[in-house]
Regions:
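Positively charged n-region of N-terminal signal peptides that target proteins for export
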Residues: 1-4
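Bacterial N-terminal signal peptides
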Residues: 7-16
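Histidine-centered catalytic micro-motifs
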Residues: 39-46, 219, 237-241
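Alpha-helix-loop-beta-strand connector modules within alpha/beta enzyme cores
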Residues: 118, 192-210, 227-237, 370
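Distinct, well-ordered alpha-helical segments
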Residues: 158-162, 223-233
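Short, contiguous, pocket-lining structural segments
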Residues: 192-199, 215-220, 252
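Substrate-binding cleft of carbohydrate-active enzyme catalytic domains
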Residues: 203-216, 222-226, 256-262, 332
Length: 417
């Protein structure tokens, strides 16, 4: 009798632990997969953090393992390697509120500080200029880096500045940020140009000619459509999700997702909870409305307004975004556009909160484990990790080689209305 009871107990223990064992198996597979096909992240904001926290001074800064990491920076070399990273597009972002000349200077400063940071770790990091250089660097076990300029305001309507950025390692430029430029409409501003203005088309032409990827995150749906019409090379969304899953205008409508295959677009999925979780997006809207209400009911009394808002927050706790919800965006993009058009664009170090399980790059294997659990093949996951974005960049380089044989650098000059 005792041996039957013992056998039954073992069966119960095995049954109870088998889901955890299965999850551990998915995670182990994800880690092994990323060791072979490391993640290239389309958008990480380390340069912005270096500006805001250190005024671009690197003396005494240890990027291998940043102390107090959870409370400040998401990213360092230790966590990138733990997450199976092989490469990053380092975002060189400056606020849209800067004056035009100051924005150009500040962007050059962002480029400079990131290049200096990479140079401090030659055994672990390298700046790549091409897809082939990226593959070679990753084979050496290094974190390869490209630069990405976040917002066309950074060039102050100058194709010459755009070319200077390319020469310094910038391999994509986001056409707008949260505000319109003089030549393109943003997703989060009232339209001024009905999409892409004539000079914006010249910007896209010149980016194609150089081999710089056109990034249409942050832009309006009409600007997205216009960029797809104009560009003869693959474009990207460096950090955006699916609008059908989260209704933010920062995400991509299905009508645009359906066009991704024709252009070779890669939509690199963002981790910002407000763009991932519809519940978080709605909470953010309600919180903003409640904050305005508290201020209007307590004019001039900031303490009373803050207390009222704190009471509302306590009664209405912020929902959490999850790894599973990020995977839902990937599922939807795969359904509409196909597996060849998905990547990862976390926005780490540019966001204040993150989905549970994706608190920093070391958690990214959790996302790939979730995809494997949902039935994605390892070949599918390898495309999402780095295959798709390297393919898009290589195709853009091929287009550029042809265009450079056919035409000289663009000489268009912006003319204000």
């Amino acid at each position: 009798m005792k041996q039957y009871l013992w056998a039954g107990a073992l069966a119960l223990v095995w049954s109870a632990s088998s889901p955890a064992r299965a999850e551990d198996a998915y995670l182990a597979r994800a880690r092994a997969l990323l060791a072979r096909s490391p993640v290239i992240d389309g958008h990480i904001d380390v340069p912005e953090q270096l500006k805001e926290r250190r005024d671009n001074k690197l003396e005494g800064f240890d990027f291998t393992n940043i102390p107090g990491q959870q409370a400040s920076y998401n990213v360092d070399l230790t966590r990138l390697k733990a997450g199976g990273y092989g490469g990053v597009f380092w975002s060189v972002y400056v606020p849209v509120e800067l004056g035009p000349d100051e924005a150009v200077r500040a962007t050059f400063d962002q480029i400079d500080v990131m290049r200096r940071l990479i140079d401090r770790y030659p055994e672990r990091m390298t700046l790549a200029a091409t897809a082939a250089e990226a593959r070679a660097g990753m084979r050496q076990g290094k974190i390869i880096g490209f630069l990405g300029a976040e917002g066309g305001h950074s060039i102050h309507n100058s194709l010459g500045v755009l070319r200077d950025f390319y020469a310094l390692g910038v391999r994509y430029m986001t056409l707008t940020h949260f505000a319109n430029t003089d030549w393109a409409d943003s997703a989060t501003a009232s339209p001024a140009h009905d999409g892409l203005a004539p000079f914006g088309r010249e910007v896209v032409h010149e980016m194609n000619r150089m081999g710089m990827l056109v990034d249409i995150s942050h832009v309006s749906a009409k600007t997205m459509a216009d960029a797809l019409d104009v560009s003869v090379a693959p474009v990207i969304f460096s950090h955006s999700g699916a609008q059908a899953v989260n209704h933010s205008p920062r995400n991509v409508p299905d009508a645009i997702l359906a066009r991704l295959p024709a252009n070779g677009v890669v939509a690199m999925v963002n981790f910002f909870p407000g763009y991932v979780s519809e519940a978080v997006r709605q909470w953010n809207g309600a919180h903003a409305a409640e904050e305005a209400r508290a201020k209007s009911l307590n004019p001039g009394d900031t303490k009373a307004a803050a207390a009222a808002l704190a009471a509302w927050d306590k009664a209405n706790p912020l929902p959490h975004a999850t790894v599973q919800q990020v995977a839902d965006h990937i599922d939807h993009i795969r359904k509409i556009a196909g597996i060849d058009h998905i990547g990862i664009g976390s926005d780490y170090d540019g966001i204040e909160t993150t989905p549970d399980g994706l608190e920093d790059p070391s958690g990214v294997p959790n996302l790939f484990a979730e995809l494997l659990r949902r039935g994605y093949s390892e070949a599918d996951c390898a495309k999402i990790a780095d295959g798709n974005i390297l393919r898009a960049l290589a195709q853009a380089e091929q287009v550029a080689a042809r265009l450079q044989r056919e035409r000289a650098p663009g000489e268009a000059v912006f003319a204000a209305k």
